[in-house]
A protein has these predicted regions:
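Hydrolase active-site cap/lid region
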Residues: 138-189, 195, 238-239
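Membrane-embedded segments
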Residues: 36-114, 122, 134
């Protein structure tokens, strides 16, 4: 029993304490006899025109929360009319627990399905950072997303086996890797995904080494554009020239999406 839950304890660090959400608006979605908490916020351009042209379904890291970032991130998309839907995983913030890896994939799909009902045909871009990239890739493999943004994507099984297996002769790493849910298989989901994708890759990532990013990039089955985050570590925010590149790349992503739909 303990070994079966070991990946949850090693990877997920949920918090429940209230966080100031700025101007973000809280909503909930029914999920597995409980609720999934989502925080929404619009960019200035979306507010000015009375609605968004693009929706960004946002998934965060293994110790992070949507209520911390949704409003702040909406402000950074100054060139686009967007609405952020930031998802708190089960067990995080106001989302019903428990926090389990096996619940992340289904929760991500439930959030997408709710957003799709709201979006009215407008494009939905799934954006995930760190473990959030595994959720975004799962959605892209299961649903018709308009595009993907993947920030330091981790191939969890491969990391456990290759980075931690040697010191225990794979006696612990092997069983732990097998406990990673198939929904969060970044390599398999990358191969199955066809939406245009933007990869944001920190070249000094100390948590998900760049060689592991590359496994996901190389497996990805759709059109892709890479943005190198030079000198950046795993949790460094996107800013400066990289933020300008991301805004430009979103325009490319949307054009690719339109081309594929013709």
């Amino acid at each position: 029993m303990f070994l079966g839950r070991l990946p949850d304890h090693l990877i997920l660090f949920p918090t429940r304490a209230p966080i100031e959400a700025g101007g973000a608006v809280r909503k909930t979605v029914s999920f597995e006899n409980g609720e999934l908490e989502i925080w929404t916020a619009q960019s200035q351009r979306a507010l000015q025109q009375g609605g968004a042209d693009i929706f960004i379904l946002r998934f965060y890291g293994n110790a992070d929360r949507a209520d911390r970032w949704a409003a702040l991130e909406a402000e950074m998309w100054s060139d686009h009319s967007i609405e952020i839907w930031g998802v708190n995983y089960p067990g995080f913030g106001g989302s019903t627990g428990p926090a389990r890896l096996v619940r992340i994939g289904p929760a991500a799909v439930a959030a997408f399905d709710e957003l799709k009902r709201h979006a009215g045909g407008r494009p939905i871009v799934a954006y995930g950072a760190s473990i959030g990239a595994t959720a975004a890739l799962h959605v892209a493999a299961q649903r018709p997303v308009g595009g993907l943004i993947l920030h330091n994507p981790p191939p969890l099984r491969e990391m456990i086996l290759r980075q931690f297996g040697w010191w225990n002769l794979w006696l612990l790493a092997g069983p732990v890797a097998l406990q990673i849910p198939p929904d969060l298989d970044s390599i398999g989901n990358a191969r199955a995904s066809r939406a245009p994708a933007i990869f944001l890759l920190a070249d000094k990532d100390e948590i998900v080494a760049p060689r592991f990013h590359r496994l996901v990039v190389d497996a990805y089955g759709g059109e892709k554009r890479l943005i190198a985050l030079r000198g950046a570590y795993h949790n460094d925010p996107i800013h400066g020239a990289a933020l300008a590149d991301l805004n430009d790349a979103l325009g490319w992503l949307l054009k690719e999406n339109l081309r594929q739909r013709r």
